[in-house]
C-alpha cells in the first residue's frame, strides 16, 4: 500500500459522507414542504381580501404559517399594518 492510496481512500470516504449528509438535508427539506397543507395560499388570499375591507395593505404584508408541535397545529398570521 502506497501512501497516496491512504489519502485517496480517505478522501472517497469523506466525499461519500458529505454526499450522504447533503442528501439527508434535501430529504428533510422535502418532507417539511410536503407537510404544508394545500389550502394555505387560498387562505392567505382570502384573509388579505377581508383585511383590505378595513385597512389598505398589499398582499405581501400578510404572512400565514402553519406549525405542528406533536398533536397540536398552530396557525400563525403576521400582518404588517401601515402607519396612520
From Swiss-Prot:
It holds the Pfam family MinE. NCBIfam families: minE (TIGR01215), PRK00296.1 (NF001422), PRK13989.1 (NF010595). This is Cell division topological specificity factor. InterPro entries: MinE, MinE_sf. Prevents the cell division inhibition by proteins MinC and MinD at internal division sites while permitting inhibition at polar sites. This ensures cell division at the proper site by restricting the formation of a division septum at the midpoint of the long axis of the cell. SUPFAM superfamilies: Cell division protein MinE topological specificity domain (SSF55229). GO terms for biological process: cell division; regulation of division septum assembly. Belongs to the MinE family. The keyword Cell division applies. Disulfide bonds: none annotated. Keywords: Cell cycle, Cell division. Coiled coil: none annotated. It comes from Pseudomonas syringae pv. tomato (strain ATCC BAA-871 / DC3000).
Amino acid at each position: 500500500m502506497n501512501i497516496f492510496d491512504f489519502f485517496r481512500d480517505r478522501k472517497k470516504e469523506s466525499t461519500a459522507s458529505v454526499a450522504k449528509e447533503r442528501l439527508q438535508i434535501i430529504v428533510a427539506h422535502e418532507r417539511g414542504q410536503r407537510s404544508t397543507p394545500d389550502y394555505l395560499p387560498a387562505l392567505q388570499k382570502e384573509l388579505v381580501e377581508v383585511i383590505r375591507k378595513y385597512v389598505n395593505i398589499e398582499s405581501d404584508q400578510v404572512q400565514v404559517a402553519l406549525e405542528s408541535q406533536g398533536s397540536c397545529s398552530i396557525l400563525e398570521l403576521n400582518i404588517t399594518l401601515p402607519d396612520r
